[in-house]
Amino acid sequence: MREVISIHIGQAGIQVGNACWELYCLEHGIQPDGQMPSDKTIGGGDDAFNTFFSETGAGKHVPRCIFLDLEPTVVDEVRTGTYRQLFHPEQLISGKEDAANNFARGHYTIGKEIVDLALDRIRKLADNCTGLQGFLVFNAVGGGTGSGLGSLLLERLSVDYGKKSKLGFTVYPSPQVSTAVVEPYNSVLSTHSLLEHTDVAVMLDNEAIYDICRRSLDIERPTYTNLNRLIAQVISSLTASLRFDGALNVDVTEFQTNLVPYPRIHFMLSSYAPIISAEKAYHEQLSVAEITNAAFEPASMMVKCDPRHGKYMACCLMYRGDVVPKDVNAAVATIKTKRTIQFVDWCPTGFKCGINYQPPTVVPGGDLAKVQRAVCMISNSTAIGEIFSRLDHKFDLMYAKRAFVHWYVGEGMEEGEFSEAREDLAALEKDFEEVGAESAEGAGEGEGEEY
């Protein structure tokens, strides 16, 4: 069995996690109390969904995940929510005081008290697996817990489970909308360890997803629930091939192999199509070609980043529902002829496709229409460099004046860590430039040696 353990850290991680598990349960027909009427074999069957759920002797399905936060309010919502009976109480870990938007509190002072407990619970989950495949880590890097405790946990996971792949779903600060003044500090410090300790990081940001909700779903004032349900659809499409059977299944480690040309360049754009409200869906065809084109639209990217400003290095398309390989090949061929979608010259083919026959499920009373087929795209583009340049610029403006730095130093950090993280990101920006620029013949004598 190829199990996957999900780790939800901090408020963003937990709320996205809630939306994900709600959707998984609907997809598999698992009730909020963990019972699954359709599953006849009691005990750990060999069903595909057992990658995400473990089964007890009483026939209850328990998610393989932990929820981790430094303060109790958000975890308490899970403890009292609709799915409270789904989770084992030990899977919900909360501390007493929060990280106060401070990376150093999450990483050093308060985080380190709780991290051993979390690793202990993860160890229990891992012991329950026959062939653990890897971890999905959900966090945001703007706050204190997601960034600080998230980095700490990833570092410790690298030590304990060195060879297992780690996929991150990371909410980055948006260009215009901000929830904390010190976001640039937290995200730069956190990205410094994401670079080292995740194999693939899928970037998300709230502003981009707000815009998608407003534009495509006609929601005037989107809430976090709207955003999270959209993110859950993306994550569900990514993991569908682990949880269901299909024609071209895609494994967690396969993402890495196909999307990461150089170890450091592993930050991905994601998009999903069709994002459409029920009123509109009734009048549209939404063929494979249409949804494939929609997935490449700059406006459907889940992070504020225009892929037309860079080149694609690799691209993964996961289709689900009523899709046959012939349609996919035709759609991809059309995409390749478009001049707007450019690939780097050293990666001519660049497409990995997966098909899953399970049609997309929607949350009843949610915003998305029930459709016959959908596609989720994860792509590695040099345009992602923009996001880091944007962050670094904001970081520099504050750090030049050493604004707010004393809060971090007071929690036991050293100023050197700021400059070290910032230099690491400067190197990353440079990596993106080189990868976009280096052509097949120039790679020999250029900066190609450092990889």
Swiss-Prot record:
Its EC number is 3.6.5.-. It catalyses: GTP + H2O = GDP + phosphate + H(+). The active site is at 254. GTP binds at residues 11, 71, 144-145, 179, 206, 228. GO terms for cellular component: cytoplasm; microtubule. The record marks 451 as: Involved in polymerization. Undergoes a tyrosination/detyrosination cycle, the cyclic removal and re-addition of a C-terminal tyrosine residue by the enzymes tubulin tyrosine carboxypeptidase (TTCP) and tubulin tyrosine ligase (TTL), respectively. The modification N6-acetyllysine is found at residue 40. Pfam families: Tubulin, Tubulin_C. Its cofactor is Mg(2+). It is found in: Cytoplasm, Cytoskeleton. SUPFAM superfamilies: Tubulin C-terminal domain-like, Tubulin nucleotide-binding domain-like. One of its GO terms (molecular function) is GTP binding. It comes from the Eukaryota. SMART domains: Tubulin, Tubulin_C. Transmembrane segments: none annotated. The keyword DNA damage does not apply. Tubulin is the major constituent of microtubules, a cylinder consisting of laterally associated linear protofilaments composed of alpha- and beta-tubulin heterodimers. Microtubules grow by the addition of GTP-tubulin dimers to the microtubule end, where a stabilizing cap forms. Below the cap, tubulin dimers are in GDP-bound state, owing to GTPase activity of alpha-tubulin. Dimer of alpha and beta chains. A typical microtubule is a hollow water-filled tube with an outer diameter of 25 nm and an inner diameter of 15 nM. Alpha-beta heterodimers associate head-to-tail to form protofilaments running lengthwise along the microtubule wall with the beta-tubulin subunit facing the microtubule plus end conferring a structural polarity. Microtubules usually have 13 protofilaments but different protofilament numbers can be found in some organisms and specialized cells. PANTHER family: TUBULIN (PTHR11588). Belongs to the tubulin family. This is Tubulin alpha-1/alpha-2 chain. It comes from Volvox carteri (Green alga).
